[in-house]
A protein has these predicted regions:
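Mobile beta-alpha loop/short-helix "lid" or hinge segments that flank ligand
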Residues: 36-47, 99, 131-151
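A glycine- and small-aliphatic-rich helix-loop capping segment at beta-alpha/alpha-beta transitions
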Residues: 94-99, 126-130
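Short, glycine-/small-residue-rich phosphate/pyrophosphate-handling segment
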Residues: 105-144, 158
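N-terminal beta1-alpha1-beta2 submodule of the flavodoxin-like/Rossmannoid cofactor-binding fold
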Residues: 1-80, 84-96, 154-178
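Phosphate-coordination loops involved in phosphoryl transfer and adenosine-cofactor binding
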Residues: 4, 103-104
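Short alpha-helix boundary/capping motifs
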Residues: 1, 120-121, 147-156
Length: 178
């Protein structure tokens, strides 16, 4: 069996304990065999400044770029805000434009929101612009995410099965790469 390579999970929500974060925490619980690192606080990243992209890059930006660069793949789980991706996630991606950290990097993404369609489309466009490798089977749109949680806080079975299938398949795909 191929050893599990490190996969970075980025939570795109501006809200602590968001539905997307809860969803990915449950994935972590059910997948202890997968080598994950979760980055769930985009609020610590300074606002994008083109003057600082190469020289005097802020420490937090260097750190997240290193996480991305050193990971075999990245999973982004995010809501949609006003038909777009959250500003903090867009900020992170803007900090990566002048680098090659996403070039040829396998990326999976889950958009969990009330609707999510436009944010999902926008994230795909941005990831392709960054040179990420995004496979159709490694994308999932979860509409009406609030209604996908049981009273005990767990994700309902049908939705969770789809998420787990995406994550498991993505991990196998990433682990098979040289």
């Amino acid at each position: 069996m191929t050893a599990s390579k490190k996969i970075l999970i980025i939570i795109g929500s501006a809200t602590k304990n968001s539905n997307n974060q809860k969803l990915m925490e449950q994935v972590l619980e059910k997948s202890p065999h997968i080598n994950f690192h979760m980055y769930d606080d985009l609020s610590v990243l300074p606002h994008f400044d083109t003057a600082l992209t190469d020289a005097d890059t802020p420490e937090e930006i260097v750190k997240i770029r290193d996480y991305i660069d050193q990971s075999a793949g990245v999973i982004i789980s995010t809501p949609e805000y006003i038909f777009s991706i959250p500003g903090r996630l867009k900020n992170l991606l803007e900090w990566c434009v002048s680098t090659n950290v996403f070039s040829d990097k396998p990326v999976a993404f889950i958009t969990g929101s009330a609707s999510g369609e436009k944010g999902h489309e926008e994230l795909l466009l941005i990831l392709k612009t960054l040179g990420a490798v995004v496979n159709d089977k490694h994308q999932l749109l979860i509409k009406a995410i609030k209604g996908k949680f049981e009273p005990d806080g767990s994700v309902e079975n049908n939705t969770f099965a789809k998420v787990l299938e995406l994550v498991t398949d993505f991990e196998k795909s990433v682990s098979s790469l040289k």
